[in-house]
C-alpha cells in the first residue's frame, strides 16, 4: 500500500503527537484502514463465511476515542475500483483467493494457527462490510462519505477545500496526493506520528523540491498505478528526478543507463501522474463529482483520461456518497442479496 519507504524517507517532516492536539477540529479518516485492522481479528470467520461483527466493534471503539478527545471525525470510505489500479487489484484478488484456499485446507487439517495466518493474509473488506459499519456510525451521529473511487484522493480533496484539518491514515499515497497534515500510526490511546508537509524544508535532499517533483520521484519508485523499473527505488528515482524536468526525460535517463525500461513505460508513468493530479472525487457541497485538483491548461482532454475514473451523474455520485448505492454495481444496497 502506498509508496514503499516514503514515510521513513520523510522522517524530518514527522514528529510525535496525540489526537487531542486536534481537539475542536474536523479530521478525516481513511476508514478502510480501521476496517482491515478490525477484520484481521475475525479473519477466520470472514474466510469461512461465518457471521461476525467484531470488525464493527473495533471500528466503533476507535471512533468513540476520537470523540472522547474532542475531535470531530469525518469517515471516508473507498468506493468503486479505479481503472488506473485494475492490474494491481486483479493481482491482489488472485493472491487473496489462493491464500484463502490454502487456509481452508489447513483449517480442515486442524492446523488452525497456520490457517489463521493465511486467512489474515486474504482478508478483503467489501462494500457490504463498510455499509454495516456506516449504519452504526449513523446511529451514533458520526459523519461519513463514501468516495466514488479512492479514499486517499477524497481525503486530499477535503483537506484542500478546508473541510478537514488533517487525515488519519497509514497510506503514504496521501503524501503524493498533496496532503499537508497526516496522522500516522494512531494507537488505541491516541498517540500518533504527525506528518507536517511544511517540515519537508528540513530535509537536505528534497527540502527545496516542489510537490510535482516529490510526486514524480514516488511514481518512478513504484506505486499502485505503475510498477517501477527493476532496480529503481526511491533513492535512484530521486537521482533521475533531480536531473530532469519531467517524467519522460527522467525515463530517458533510465534508458541511457541501460536499465530494462519496458515498452510503454513513458505513457504508463504519465497516466499515473495524471491520476494523482486529477482523480475524480466527491464534492459534498455540490453533491457531484469534482477533481482532486482542478483541471488546468496542461491537462489532456477528459476523453483521453478514462483512467481517472468514470464520470458519474449527480444522482449516482450522491447515492454512493451517502451509502445508499453500492459503489461497484451502483445498485441500491437494499437490492443486493448477500
Label for each model-derived stretch:
Residues 98-99, 107-109, 199-201, 260-264, ...:
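Short, intrinsically disordered/low-complexity patches at protein termini
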Amino acid at each position: 500500500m502506498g509508496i514503499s519507504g516514503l514515510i521513513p524517507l520523510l522522517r524530518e517532516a514527522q514528529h510525535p503527537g496525540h489526537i487531542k492536539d486536534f481537539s475542536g477540529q474536523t479530521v478525516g479518516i481513511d476508514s478502510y484502514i480501521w476496517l482491515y485492522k478490525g477484520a484481521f481479528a475475525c479473519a477466520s470467520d470472514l474466510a469461512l463465511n461465518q457471521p461476525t461483527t467484531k470488525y464493527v466493534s473495533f471500528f466503533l471503539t476507535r471512533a468513540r476515542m476520537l470523540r472522547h478527545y474532542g475531535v470531530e471525525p469525518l469517515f471516508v470510505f473507498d468506493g468503486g475500483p479505479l481503472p488506473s489500479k485494475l492490474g494491481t487489484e486483479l493481482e491482489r484478488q488472485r493472491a487473496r483467493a489462493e491464500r484463502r484456499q490454502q487456509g481452508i485446507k489447513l483449517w480442515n487439517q486442524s492446523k488452525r494457527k497456520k490457517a489463521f495466518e493465511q486467512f489474515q493474509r486474504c482478508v478483503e473488506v467489501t462494500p457490504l462490510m463498510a455499509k454495516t459499519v456506516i449504519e452504526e456510525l449513523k446511529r451514533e451521529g458520526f459523519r461519513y462519505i463514501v468516495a466514488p473511487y479512492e479514499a486517499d484522493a477524497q481525503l486530499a480533496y477535503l483537506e484542500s477545500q478546508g473541510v478537514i484539518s488533517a487525515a488519519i491514515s497509514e497510506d503514504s499515497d496521501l503524501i503524493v496526493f498533496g496532503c499537508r497534515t497526516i496522522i500516522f500510526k494512531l494507537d488505541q490511546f491516541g498517540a500518533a506520528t504527525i506528518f507536517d508537509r511544511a517540515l519537508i524544508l528540513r530535509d537536505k535532499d528534497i527540502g527545496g523540491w516542489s510537490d510535482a517533483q516529490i510526486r514524480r520521484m514516488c511514481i518512478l519508485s513504484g506505486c499502485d498505478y505503475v510498477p517501477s523499473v527493476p532496480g529503481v527505488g526511491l533513492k535512484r528515482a530521486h537521482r533521475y528526478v533531480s536531473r530532469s524536468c519531467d517524467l519522460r526525460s527522467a525515463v530517458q535517463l533510465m534508458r541511457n543507463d541501460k536499465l530494462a525500461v519496458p515498452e510503454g513505460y513513458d505513457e504508463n508513468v504519465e497516466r499515473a501522474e495524471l491520476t494523482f493530479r486529477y482523480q475524480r472525487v466527491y464534492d459534498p457541497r455540490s453533491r457531484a463529482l469534482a477533481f482532486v485538483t482542478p483541471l488546468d491548461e496542461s491537462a489532456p482532454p477528459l476523453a483521453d483520461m478514462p483512467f481517472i475514473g468514470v464520470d458519474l451523474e449527480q444522482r449516482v455520485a450522491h447515492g454512493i456518497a451517502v451509502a445508499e448505492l453500492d459503489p461497484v454495481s451502483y445498485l441500491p444496497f437494499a437490492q443486493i442479496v448477500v
